[in-house]
């Protein structure tokens, strides 16, 4: 009976060591993950995308239409973002990209990150869509209404802030694309269609 406590302590020691090793391993993995520049960029991109579509979605009034009929439809308060397909496109694309970044962050955390080629392709497609709608939105924002000192986004602060974050996200995405391309190149562009392989040999990047 007297040996039972000692035997119990001896039995616990291996378990405590395993738990300690597991906690230490998890801490080390998280430390390495946070030192990964691509992962840190991903966190920032996720936050910026969330800010972009949230601010644009908050623009429920204040926008002016370039046509008198639009002004009459919206009244003195002005139009919401839903009256403009360009702004709706920004909300849709950036909301989709934010969802993608959340999934990607989870995959990094569980150490199931996609290959660089997949990341590059997805980032390139999202960035192209972002750039298209942001350019159209900026053009629409700057459109003159009635007089030269009155433009579509003059009283639309949320939209202006949204487009600033949208442009910054595109810049960061381009840097991530370049980083993913370099990683893919180190893997000899595995998975790239043969028709494009000649381009990578000529222009390795």
Swiss-Prot record:
Record localization: Cell membrane
Domain of life: Eukaryota
Chief subcellular location: membrane
Keywords, alphabetical: Cell membrane, Membrane, Transmembrane, Transmembrane helix
Extracellular compartment residues: 58-89, 146-159
Coiled coil: none
Membrane topology label: Multi-pass membrane protein
Family statement drawn from the similarity comment of this UniProt entry: Belongs to the Casparian strip membrane proteins (CASP) family.
Official protein name in the record: CASP-like protein 0U1
Species of provenance: Ostreococcus lucimarinus (strain CCE9901)
């Amino acid at each position: 009976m007297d040996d039972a406590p000692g035997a119990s302590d001896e039995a616990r020691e291996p378990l405590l060591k395993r738990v300690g090793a597991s906690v230490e391993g998890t801490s080390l993995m998280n430390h390495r993950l946070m030192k990964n520049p691509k992962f840190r960029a991903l966190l920032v991109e996720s936050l910026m995308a969330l800010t972009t579509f949230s601010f644009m979605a908050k623009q429920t009034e204040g926008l002016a239409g370039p046509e008198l009929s639009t002004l009459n439809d919206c009244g003195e308060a002005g139009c919401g973002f839903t009256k403009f397909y360009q702004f709706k496109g920004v909300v849709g694309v950036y909301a989709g990209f934010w969802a993608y970044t959340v999934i990607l962050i989870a995959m990094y955390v569980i150490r199931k990150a996609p290959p660089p080629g997949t990341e590059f392709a997805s980032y390139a497609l999202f960035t192209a869509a972002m750039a298209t709608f942001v350019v159209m939105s900026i053009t629409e924002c700057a459109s003159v209404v009635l007089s030269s000192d009155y433009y579509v986004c003059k009283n639309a602060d949320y939209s202006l802030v949204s487009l600033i974050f949208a442009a910054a996200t595109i810049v960061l995405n381009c840097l991530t694309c370049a980083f993913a391309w370099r990683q893919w190149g180190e893997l000899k562009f595995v998975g790239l269609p043969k028709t494009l392989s000649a381009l990578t040999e000529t222009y390795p990047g």
